[in-house]
């Protein structure tokens, strides 16, 4: 019987099989998701050379209290005995594993709110944010730090060093040839923390909003804006402009829906770089949003979906169709100051809103949402129709504005300036400009 050697065939087949496995292993290293948010919530802080667990969102005062390192700051005269907290540096640390973000082409470390003066380090080296510095100095801005390519395999070490705000403010004040009545104005920080007639002085620091990695491959979809260009009794016309950042020429399907009904569906060819898309929707016989006491505060669910291969990116905002106008007409005694909603003048019955907690990170999570809802429900039940957010506090959390939308409460939003002379140098103004841009974009889709 003639014998045939199968070994060479097996060897060739095995080599092909090995190449096949290695090739697809390399390809599969790339994460199949468009976008992923990875929370960084397990942090520690150092006090007297010892590490303690920290809560994020949080602040140093609540972290000290939760670890029983201080007593209740609101009891008796403890406000005076706890002023040392705001006068020293505090260090927060965490670690993350490189495997958490492997497979993503783009990764940024994001602080949605960090209070206030801090330096950021990765593995002992300064981590630069998109403006080319590792220092942050505004609690009302989002700060983004692109991660470098040379991360360590395994554990990587993040460190946030908080610098005392009063020390910075005194140093800035000493540069002036005159004395200011308030030094707090040099920091873009909640003014009320420096003490007010209604509350104590607790100059705190910390990560008062979430901290996370923003990871993406191929495309990144930006927030859409709701632009109402026409509204009458028969129809409404809205545009939903947004941007998509693309690594290459790509095809995506863009769908825009209102309350689950599709009003726009197009296949779009993206170019490499930034792409502006502007879906337009026409809604027949829209129900209008009215302030409390005038009618129903009708809200629609506006949704944009971007389909890219098997991935779907989805973004939602609730919106009320309405017109709001401030009418100022010259008369015999000056100028009128009249709000007109959906063509009808409205008598404003308002309330002044100050922060609901001395430590504002306490308004995060379920407990904070419940408190927002209860306080705003009291405003609605008192027949009020407008809430003014005082400029000595903060730009509020998203839950606050959502409940105002639902309850028919107009919001008069101050920029955060109050009862002080503020610097006018170019650096300060540029910082405030970025703050204003970020907050306007964040809040613009509330009716």
Residue ranges and their predicted role:
Residues 339, 347, 351-357, 415-428, ...:
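Substrate-binding/active-site clefts of carbohydrate-active enzymes
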Residues 428-446:
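An active-site-proximal structural segment forming one wall of the substrate-binding cleft
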Residues 1-11, 15-19, 29-387:
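Secreted/periplasmic carbohydrate-active enzymes, especially glycoside hydrolases
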Residues 137-143, 392-396, 431-435:
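Short, glycine/acidic-rich beta->alpha junctions
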Residues 375-382, 386-430:
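Aromatic-lined substrate-binding rim segments of carbohydrate-active enzymes
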Residues 344, 403-407, 440-447:
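Acidic (Asp/Glu)-rich catalytic clusters
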């Amino acid at each position: 019987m003639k014998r045939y050697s199968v070994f060479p065939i097996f060897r060739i087949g095995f080599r092909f099989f090995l190449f096949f496995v290695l090739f697809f292993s390399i390809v599969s290293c790339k994460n199949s998701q468009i976008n992923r948010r990875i929370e960084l919530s397990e942090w520690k802080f150092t006090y007297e050379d010892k590490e303690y667990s920290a809560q994020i969102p949080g602040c140093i005062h609540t972290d000290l209290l939760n670890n029983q390192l201080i007593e209740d700051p609101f009891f008796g005269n403890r406000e005076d005995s706890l002023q040392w907290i705001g006068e020293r540096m505090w260090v927060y640390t965490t670690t993350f594993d490189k495997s958490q973000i492997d497979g993503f082409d783009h990764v940024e470390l994001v602080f949605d709110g960090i209070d206030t003066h801090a330096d950021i380090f990765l593995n002992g080296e300064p981590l630069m944010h998109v403006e080319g510095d590792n220092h942050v100095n505004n609690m009302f801005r989002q700060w983004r730090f692109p991660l470098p390519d040379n991360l360590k395999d395994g554990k990587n070490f993040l460190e946030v060093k908080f610098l005392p705000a009063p020390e910075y403010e005194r140093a800035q004040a000493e540069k002036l040839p005159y004395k200011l009545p308030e030094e707090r104005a040099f920091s873009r920080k909640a003014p009320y923390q420096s003490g007010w007639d209604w509350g104590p002085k607790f100059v705190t620091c910390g990560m008062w909003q979430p901290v996370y990695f923003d990871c993406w491959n191929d495309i990144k979809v930006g927030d859409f804006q709701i632009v109402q260009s026409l509204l009458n009794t028969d129809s409404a016309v809205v545009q939903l402009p947004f941007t998509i950042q693309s690594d290459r020429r790509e095809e995506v399907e863009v769908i825009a829906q209102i309350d689950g009904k599709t009003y726009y569906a197009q296949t779009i060819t993206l170019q490499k770089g930034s792409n502006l898309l502007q879906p337009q929707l026409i809604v027949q016989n829209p129900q209008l949003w009215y302030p409390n006491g005038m009618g129903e505060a009708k809200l629609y669910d506006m949704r944009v979906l971007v389909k890219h291969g098997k991935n779907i990116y989805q973004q939602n905002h609730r919106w009320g169709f309405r017109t709001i106008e401030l009418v100022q007409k010259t008369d015999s005694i000056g100028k009128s100051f009249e709000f007109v909603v959906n063509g009808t003048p409205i008598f404003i019955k308002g309330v002044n809103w100050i922060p609901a907690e001395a430590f504002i990170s306490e308004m995060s999570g379920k407990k904070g949402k419940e408190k927002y809802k209860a306080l705003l429900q009291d405003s609605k039940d008192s027949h009020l129709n407008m809430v003014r957010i005082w400029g000595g506090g903060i730009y509020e959390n998203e839950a606050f504005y959502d409940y105002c939308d639902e309850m028919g409460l107009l919001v008069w939003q101050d920029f955060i300036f109050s009862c002080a002379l503020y610097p006018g140098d170019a650096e300060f103004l540029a910082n405030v400009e970025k703050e204003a841009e970020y907050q306007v974009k964040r809040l613009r889709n509330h009716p």
